[in-house]
Amino acid sequence: MSTDLVGTLAKQQPSSTRLQRRPNTALPFCDATLLPEPILYDTTVYIDVLHGKLSDHLKREIARLEPWHCSVAESEMTYLCGRLDPAHYGTGHVVRQIASIVDYWPPNRVLIPDRAIWREAAILTGILSRLQHARDEDRGRTMNDALIFLSALQHGCTVLSRNVRDFDLLMQLVPAGKAVFYRI
């Protein structure tokens, strides 16, 4: 990816009309199919693992794969460790659960967005904010999704996510990027 701002902007020429989420029938869901490889997990996967919400099919698929992870998903999860009230009786348990996930990641399987990815993600976030008339408080979430999506693209991965809305819009803006969705 280029670190040239003008070149990056030139690649993004979306219309000025609001993007529409496509119907589920037009999107890749992994309800009963094998997951593509290589696969990069979105934060929703870890959250759903912690809550025990994954289907048996998806559990089998996850057990079969050697996934990629992203430092952005790690930051989204570990943010909770600081956000939760340390005096609350359940905080220690949640922190241990999060630590058990991120400490398990092999360092050589963690993608870290580089400068070019950050630049492209910022541009995509701005475009989505403009086209979707997004609230300022949604910018951080959108930026994180764009960072994960573009990191996957840079490394030839497909994102696995439950977040259909945001990753569908990202795929519409950057058709070379790939995501596959699951339901809980």
Q: Locations of the language-model features?
A:
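Short, well-structured N-terminal submotif of metal-dependent ribonuclease cores
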Residues: 1-76, 80-99
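Acidic, PIN/NYN-like endoribonuclease modules and their adjacent C-terminal/linker elements
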Residues: 1-33, 149-184
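Active-site neighborhoods of divalent-metal-dependent phosphate/nucleic-acid chemistry enzymes
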Residues: 2-10, 18-19, 24, 79-84, ...
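Alpha-helix capping/helix-boundary segments
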Residues: 45-46, 117, 148, 165-167
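Conserved beta-strand scaffold positions in the cores of enzyme catalytic domains, especially
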Residues: 67, 110-111, 178-183
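Phosphate- and divalent-cation-binding pockets in alpha/beta enzyme and binding domains
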Residues: 76, 120, 169
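Short, hinge-like loop/turn segments at secondary-structure boundaries
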Residues: 85-89, 128-129, 177-179
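Short, flexible, basic/aromatic active-site loop/helix in glycosyltransferases
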Residues: 97-107
